[in-house]
Regions:
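Mid-to-C-terminal alpha-helical segments outside catalytic/metal-binding sites
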Residues: 2-26, 34-44, 67-87, 259-260, ...
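Active-site metal-binding loops of divalent metal-dependent hydrolases
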Residues: 46, 93, 202, 275-276
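Short aromatic-enriched loop/helix-cap "lid" or pocket-rim segments at secondary-structure transitions
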Residues: 52-57, 129-130, 210-212, 243-245, ...
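Short, small-residue-enriched loops and turns at beta-alpha junctions
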Residues: 95-96, 123-124, 149-153, 205-208, ...
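Short helix-capping segments at alpha-helix termini
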Residues: 109-112, 138, 191-196, 226-227, ...
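Catalytic pocket-lining loop regions of alpha/beta-barrel enzymes
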Residues: 155-271
Length: 322
C-alpha cells in the first residue's frame, strides 16, 4: 500500500502553496564561468525511468542506445546545478497506470522534484478512480494527453467530463502533438475556461531556421487568444530533427520560432522546459540552456524570471516543499 494524503488541496491552499514555492525558490542568481548570470529555473519537462527494476519499462525500448539506461533525478540535478535549475516537473511518458505512482514515490523523498505531470487516459472508464487516487497527492499537478486523443475526445461527453474533473481540482493539462495541436487546444480552452492548458514543444514544429509556417502561426494565435493557454518552449533542439547531437547552436537559427512565440504569447505564458534526456539526441543541456537564456535575457530581467520560473508556477502551481 502507498501512503497518500487523504484530501484534495483546495483553491486557497494551492494559491498559498504556489506563493510559498516562489518565495522559497527565488535565490540569488548564479554566476557561472564567463560571468553569466543564470536565473532561477524550474525545468518543466524531464523524464525519469529505471529499466533495471523488476517490471522493466515500456519506454524507451531496449533498442534505443541513447535513452535505454537508468535515468534518475540525481543525475539531472548535478547536470543542471551550474545553470541554477532549482527543481523539475516530471512528465510521465509511460502508459502504465502504476508508473504514475512510481513517480510519486520517487518524488516523495526528493525535494528537487516540484511536481508530476501524470499519464492517464480521459477516455478510460476507470479514469475517475485513477484520477482521484493520484490527485490526492498535491505533487500530482496534472496529466498529459496526446493531440489525436484530444481531437476525438472533444466529441465525447464523458471525456470532457473527466477533463472538467481536472479543472475542478485546480490541476492542469499538458497537450502534446503536431502543428495542428493548438486548434484543438483552443476549442478545449473555450469549453473549459478554468482549465490551465500547456502546449508541449511548440506543437512540435519542424525548426529549419526559416520563417515559421503560416498555418502553425495562425493555430498558435488561436490558442493564445485564450488566457488559460500556455506554451512550453521545450524540445527546441529536437525541432531541428537532428539526432546526432548536431543541432545548430546559434540563437539566430531559432529566432524565427522564438520571436513568433514571444509575439503570440507574450512574457506571461511562455515556459522553460528541456525534454531531457531525450534532448541529448539533438544537443547538450548547455547548448539548449544558452539559446533560451540568451534570448529571454534580451527581453529584460522581469521577462526572463517569468520564463524560467514564475510562469511555470502560474501554470502548474506546484506545492511548497518544506
Amino acid at each position: 500500500m502507498h501512503n497518500e494524503p487523504t484530501c484534495h488541496p483546495n483553491r486557497r491552499n494551492i494559491i498559498a502553496s504556489a506563493a510559498g514555492f516562489l518565495a522559497a525558490a527565488l535565490v540569488s542568481e548564479i554566476k557561472a564561468e564567463g560571468g553569466v548570470d543564470y536565473f532561477p529555473a524550474i525545468d518543466t519537462h524531464t523524464h525519469f525511468y529505471d529499466p533495471t527494476r523488476p517490471q522493466g519499462i515500456p519506454w524507451p525500448g531496449k533498442g534505443d542506445s541513447v535513452l535505454y539506461r537508468k535515468v534518475m533525478p540525481d543525475e539531472f540535478q548535478k547536470l543542471t546545478a551550474p545553470y541554477n535549475v532549482q527543481s523539475t516537473i516530471i512528465v510521465e511518458a509511460s502508459a502504465w497506470v502504476e508508473d504514475n505512482q512510481w513517480l510519486l514515490d520517487l518524488a516523495k523523498g526528493d525535494k528537487f522534484i516540484a511536481g508530476i505531470v501524470g499519464r492517464l487516459d480521459p477516455a478510460d472508464k476507470e479514469f475517475s478512480a485513477h484520477w482521484k487516487r493520484f490527485a490526492k497527492n498535491p505533487l500530482y499537478v496534472g496529466i498529459r494527453v496526446n493531440h489525436s486523443d484530444l481531437q476525438k475526445g472533444l466529441e465525447d461527453k464523458s471525456y470532457l467530463e473527466n477533463i472538467r474533473m481536472i479543472a475542478s481540482d485546480q490541476r492542469q493539462l499538458d497537450v502534446n502533438g503536431g502543428p495542428a495541436t493548438p486548434v484543438e487546444v483552443a476549442k478545449l480552452a473555450k469549453l473549459i475556461p478554468d482549465l490551465r492548458i500547456v502546449i508541449n514543444h511548440e506543437a512540435n514544429l519542424v525548426i529549419d531556421g526559416k520563417d515559421v509556417p503560416k498555418d502553425w502561426l495562425e493555430a498558435m494565435q488561436l490558442a493564445a487568444s485564450n488566457k488559460n493557454v500556455f506554451c512550453k518552449v521545450s524540445a527546441l533542439a529536437e525541432g531541428t530533427r537532428k539526432t546526432m547531437g548536431d543541432a545548430p547552436k546559434d540563437l539566430e537559427f531559432y529566432k524565427p520560432v522564438l520571436d513568433s512565440l514571444w509575439n503570440v504569447f507574450g512574457e506571461d505564458r511562455l515556459i522553460f522546459g528541456s525534454n531531457w534526456p531525450v534532448s541529448v539526441r539533438a544537443a547538450t543541456y548547455a547548448t539548449i540552456h544558452r539559446i533560451v537564456h540568451t534570448y529571454f535575457s534580451s527581453k529584460g530581467k522581469i521577462a526572463a524570471e517569468k520564463y524560467f520560473m514564475k510562469n511555470a508556477i502560474a501554470a502548474y502551481k506546484p506545492p511548497t516543499r518544506g
